[in-house]
Amino acid sequence: MSRIDDLLKHMTLEEKIAMLAGADLWHSVANQRLNIPQFKVTDGPNGARGAWGGMATPSVCTPVGIALGATWNPEVVEKVGNVLADELEAKGAHILLAPTVNIHRTPIAGRNFECYSEDPFLSGMIASAYIKGIQDKGKGACIKHFVANDQEFERFSISSEVDERTLREIYLEPFRIAIRNSDPWAVMSAYNRVNGAYACENDHTLNDILKGEWGYKGIVMSDWFGTYDKGVPSGGLDLEMPGQARWMSEEMVKRALDDGPLTEEILDDKVRRLLGVLEKAGLFGKPELNPEGGEDKPQHRKIMREAAREAIVLLKNDGTLPLKKVKSIAVIGPYAAQAQILGGGSSSVTPHYAVSPFEGIKNRAGKKIKVDTAPGCHIYKSLPAPAPETLSTEDGRVGLSLSLFNGTEFGGAPMYTEVTPRVNQGWFDKSVPNVNQESFSLRMEGFFTPKESGVHTLALSAVGWCKMYLNDEVVIDHSSDADMGKQLVAEVELKGGKPYPIKVEYYWKGSPRWRSVGIGHQPPQPLDLMGEAVKLARKSDVAVVIASLNGEWESEGFDRVDMKLPGEQDELIRRVVKANKNTIVVVNVGSAVEMPWIDKVPAVLQLWYDGQEQGNALADILFGDENPSGKLPTTFPVRLEDNPAYINYPGENGKVRYGEGLFVGYRYYDKKKVEPLFPFGHGLSYTDFKYSNFKLSAKSITPKDKLTVKVDVTNTGKVTGKEIVQLYVRDVQSTFARPEKELKAFAKVEVKPGKTKTAAFTLDREAFWYFDAAKNAWNIEPGGFEILVGASSRDIRLNGAITLEPEPRAARFHTGLTVGTLLDHPESRAVLSRHIGGFLLMADMNSAVGMTLEQVASNHPNFVPQKLLAQIEQELAQIK
């Protein structure tokens, strides 16, 4: 008997039920009597964060999801997964709540930066590598959010109204691919509803498809607080998070057992899955969970830099890049000198370090090239934290002294102390050890030493009550309930280089929820911020403008309102390029943005939120130390109105209709002949590649066969480069609506100057199938198909044709034959007459005779339902 079977045999009903919800925010429930340990989860996907907010230990910060998608390189992504497994070990955790594989349905969705692509195949393959990298090292991944969680607007309640074929081919497909390839330990259900039923208890998606059709054996956990009613225990969910139990409580589960449809057999299956995670993690017989920590390892830095480089996409280049023979560089933009490497929300981590574009460029330039910076404009909605080097403790350490006390009076010995440069603190649930979550106080104190003299703006924000003191005088009083959640500011005249005593006292009283306190600062500003940047650009050989979004504009919890760069960044770019024709725009965002200045600038790089090595990776590309090799994993439309979801987004009356159906991203732009700003798969190089010698292993295949496709890629330039060869399939003769082409394979090949590499692909039946909703099955329609290879979805270099023959059947007669063929033979004609004679008499026989009986059934399900079709198939098979 296995360990799991033995434990199930000895567990009481109450002990089984207790496992179905978390113990707290991050842990499963342990069972002391049976020595069942607990596992720990932590947020991702941009790192393994550990505890929330200011108490978080430092972590590796990876490039965000869309950046990993832009690498088109599963090998590199797998290495990133290996690093994240190490980080999980350092955090004492076992499962990373990642990857996020929702689809880029609209370019303004708040969490697009977390997700890989608009294409389900690319998403699934990148997710497979990410999961494999984590799980090969004995840790687990939790793929999310299952399913159709593609916007933040009304995300806790909106119903994604999506037809079955689109659900299968687009939104479920990345999950199916990743589960088939890498078998993640866990799947996280989404907050939203899918066709009316909440995703956390959706019988069709969780039980019928995930656990039934796909045979998934891992656990299904809820998103945090993402359970809603009494249907949860029987709806396919295994673990309600976080604890304490609400809908998976002993009372609710016992009621579901009494009333049905929950059975003890289903309950045992849930517990078996949870015990299976503990076994995979090797936790039985292990000591207590490790405390959280973090280690900044050289090999991790190397992998982060490699991934960051491979993610950068060269969108446009009129010969300006790579930089050569320059003596001065102006690095301009609101985040030129500050590393903006994350969107907002639960994916955020506290990085060990972060290299800004200015820092990376300056370090690479050395002493012979003068590098200066200017912001040009600001885009923050709230003042950012003071620079760490301006904060110090009494003994000279960087940061402020932080102390936490029980009660609201700052009395007695502190329960927790540390010195931290992180002056934006946040707490959620039970993140702070030994502190009364319903009544505590905090003090941050030390010295603030401004870099320059003049009028400085200090800021204080809080969910709670607090005051800021400077020189022992209150400068900001944030103790009014009316100011809860707001940032209050005060202007003070300060002398540069002089240390000023600063103190913030904060307290909380009430039920535990999200609580926070943060300090902001803005130094004296020039009267003409943009003018200063333009002057710098004019006197420099090259201007590099870092155009950005940030976590205030692009975040979990809300969608963007448009595709525009916030603030005055478009105007800044126009003025800088007018002052210096050698202007390079570097777009530091997590999704598509409008670029009204695109025709005016000679070079554009897509940087993304590129992780802790952002600045170094950018410098590698700018100076030509590395050749850009990223390609867009999502289409950049010219304007928001061009995107296929525009008409139906955000929805109304609690529903959002996925009216574009299959035609998401490039599938839509191809079908409607709409010219995008930059197409899916686009990305330039510092060299050129020639495609040749296109070969197909056969001209005719059956669905059981595999097709080998080969193409030679020659580097015709002067530097080594990597090309992403993209293979698309087009159904030439489909009865059903099909996209113009669909990505079915890709390969990233590195080729030296003058050399040739062969990219080889193997296609199986999945490259040709579509989902037939009438049959509730994947189907392959015989006929002509085109195999296309190219450098992007709009840059097809070579193509070839194949014929897909019908799958051989043992029976002489079957429903895959045309109606005309079946009517030509007396025995088969008798079967048709007996079952659908009336329909055939009234049908348009000119069109019907050329269709297979299966196609007739699909087109006319009311007259030829699937049950009847199966009966006809059975009778036809009996004809000798």
Show where each model-derived region lies:
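Terminal connector regions
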Residues: 764-807
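Glycoside hydrolase catalytic-domain context in secreted enzymes
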Residues: 1-457, 461-769, 785-788, 793
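Mature N-terminal, pre-catalytic/accessory segment of carbohydrate-active enzymes
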Residues: 1-22, 804-816, 847-849, 872, ...
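Compact, charge-rich alpha-helical regulatory domains located at protein termini
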Residues: 808-876
